[in-house]
């Protein structure tokens, strides 16, 4: 609809954009967005603003979504082809695309070292929906054992979504407080506490706890990988007390770490009872999945949960392709290789500013650079120079580019980020 604003004059286009964003905005005020930027198209790891005739290297990938790049031609072809066949028929009936995707999720997960007892899949539309399903399934399992077994353990610095259940297990009070009372019986623990303290809490409350939800790599909290020994110990104590373990892999899963799932790097003893996926699963098309083992599935009955759009043929067709591409060892190896390139560049920048940068952490193509002060000015300067990055937590800049990003684009983006850091710190 905005084509009518484009002209051969850059000034005219910029004036048109200002009019759109300042005078013609019909969206609620829930987002803080720059008023001088409007994305009009993308190509793999780059985005373009045709209003301002600007090109950006994108190290955000739509917040770890477009794993196979913007405007992926094969994804576009699949969407177009499937749209001419069947878009939606609801979960009243089976569809081939849904059946294929469910099988592929289970088989690929097992093949690439993920949840060894993965059994069934619930398909929905977004990460928060996938986590809602996981929480409901855990509570249902708990209640079948003991009517009082309804509580959920979550962790400080967690982020699991913005719908009421997922919001209830999200740590940051700025997201929770404005909405009053949320889902009860949620306890937040500190993953950095001694294991003995965490175990004591669980042992004391074991008859009241249905599930535990955790991100193997905390994303919004600042890109913090959870130590393997902590995840092993958590699963052990939870299994002993019949508590369902949920891994939120919405941001860190699907090849992001160089493994198909972040938990694929863990021993089987630390595998979850449930894990969730979204974001990259549709490469930008809304689709998500909640994967459960047989123990969880046995607690469920027809009608316990549902969704109108979840598992629609359009989304499933795309996701089948995404899994085919990412669920390939050569592709995963390429992510690891690109991740090493990104890591090397970020560590070099840290070495130049030891008094300003306190840490570089992550794996594959999910990295966080922690500054000693809030990095908002650096993010803004990077954008001015042609690089899009985002924050995670209060002091960390997050790097989650498309998994298909070219090596030379990684290098170019690092050069821009280095200049942004130098420009800000030289003031």
From Swiss-Prot:
EC number of the protein: 2.6.1.11
Q: Which SUPFAM superfamilies match?
A: PLP-dependent transferases
Q: Catalytic activity annotated for this protein?
A: N(2)-acetyl-L-ornithine + 2-oxoglutarate = N-acetyl-L-glutamate 5-semialdehyde + L-glutamate
Q: Which InterPro entries match?
A: AcOrn/SuccOrn_fam, Aminotrans_3, Aminotrans_3_PPA_site, Class-III_PLP-dep_AT, PyrdxlP-dep_Trfase, PyrdxlP-dep_Trfase_major, PyrdxlP-dep_Trfase_small
Q: Name one GO molecular function term.
A: identical protein binding
In which pathway is this protein known to take part?
Amino-acid biosynthesis; L-arginine biosynthesis; N(2)-acetyl-L-ornithine from L-glutamate: step 4/4
Q: Its domain of life? A: Eukaryota
Q: Name a Pfam family for this protein.
A: Aminotran_3
Q: Which residue spans adopt a coiled-coil conformation according to this UniProt entry?
A: none
Per UniProt, subcellular location reads as: Mitochondrion matrix
Task: Check the record and name the PROSITE patterns matching this protein.
Answer: AA_TRANSFER_CLASS_3
Q: What class of enzyme is it?
A: transferase
Question: Which cellular component appears as one GO term in the record?
Answer: mitochondrial matrix
Predominant location: mitochondrion
Q: Which cofactor does it need?
A: pyridoxal 5'-phosphate
Q: Which residues carry this modification: N6-(pyridoxal phosphate)lysine?
A: 279
Alphabetically sorted, this entry's keywords are:
Amino-acid biosynthesis, Aminotransferase, Arginine biosynthesis, Mitochondrion, Pyridoxal phosphate, Transferase, Transit peptide
Gene Ontology biological-process entries: arginine biosynthetic process via ornithine; L-arginine biosynthetic process
Family under the similarity heading: Belongs to the class-III pyridoxal-phosphate-dependent aminotransferase family.
| Protein name, UniProt field | Acetylornithine aminotransferase, mitochondrial
> What is the source species?
Candida glabrata (strain ATCC 2001 / BCRC 20586 / JCM 3761 / NBRC 0622 / NRRL Y-65 / CBS 138)
What phylogenetic lineage does the species belong to? Eukaryota, Fungi, Dikarya, Ascomycota, Saccharomycotina
| Gene name linked to the record | ARG8
């Amino acid at each position: 609809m905005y084509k009518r604003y484009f002209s051969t004059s850059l000034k005219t286009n910029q004036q048109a954009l200002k009019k759109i964003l300042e005078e013609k905005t019909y969206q609620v005020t829930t987002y803080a967005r720059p008023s001088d930027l409007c994305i009009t198209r993308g190509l793999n790891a780059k985005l373009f603003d045709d209003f301002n005739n600007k090109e950006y290297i994108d190290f955000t990938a739509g917040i770890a979504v477009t794993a196979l790049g913007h405007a992926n031609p094969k994804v576009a072809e699949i969407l177009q082809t499937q749209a001419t066949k069947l878009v939606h028929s609801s979960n009243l009936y089976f569809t081939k695309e849904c059946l294929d995707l469910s099988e592929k999720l289970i088989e690929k997960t097992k093949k690439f070292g993920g949840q060894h007892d993965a059994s069934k899949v619930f398909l929905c539309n977004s990460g928060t929906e996938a986590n809602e399903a996981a929480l409901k399934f855990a509570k249902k399992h708990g209640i079948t054992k003991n009517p009082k077994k309804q509580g959920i353990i979550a962790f400080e610095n967690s982020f699991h979504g913005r719908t009421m259940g997922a919001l209830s297990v999200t740590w940051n009070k700025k997201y929770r407080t404005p909405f009053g009372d949320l889902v009860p019986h949620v306890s937040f623990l500190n993953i950095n506490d001694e294991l003995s303290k965490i175990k004591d809490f669980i042992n004391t409350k074991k008859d009241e706890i249905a599930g535990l939800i955790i991100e193997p790599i905390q994303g919004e909290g600042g890109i913090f990988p959870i130590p393997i020994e902590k995840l092993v110990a958590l699963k052990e104590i939870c299994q002993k007390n019949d508590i369902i373990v949920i891994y939120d892999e919405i941001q860190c899963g699907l090849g992001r770490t160089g493994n198909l799932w972040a938990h694929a790097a863990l021993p089987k003893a630390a595998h979850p009872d449930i894990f969730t996926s979204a974001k990259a699963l549709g490469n930008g098309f809304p689709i998500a999945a909640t994967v459960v083992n047989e123990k969880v599935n046995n607690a469920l009955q027809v009608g316990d949960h549902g969704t109108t759009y979840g598992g629609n043929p359009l989304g499933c067709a795309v996701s089948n392709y995404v899994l085919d591409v990412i669920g390939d060892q050569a592709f995963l190896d390429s992510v690891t290789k690109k991740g090493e390139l990104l890591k090397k560049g970020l560590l070099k920048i840290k070495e130049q500013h030891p008094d300003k940068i306190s840490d570089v952490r992550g794996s594959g193509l999910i990295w966080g650079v922690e500054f000693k002060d809030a990095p908002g000015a650096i993010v803004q300067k990077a954008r001015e120079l042609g690089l899009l990055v985002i924050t995670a937590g209060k002091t960390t800049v997050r790097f989650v580019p498309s998994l298909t990003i070219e090596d030379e684009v990684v290098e170019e983006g690092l050069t821009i980020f280095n200049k942004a850091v130098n420009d800000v710190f030289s003031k």
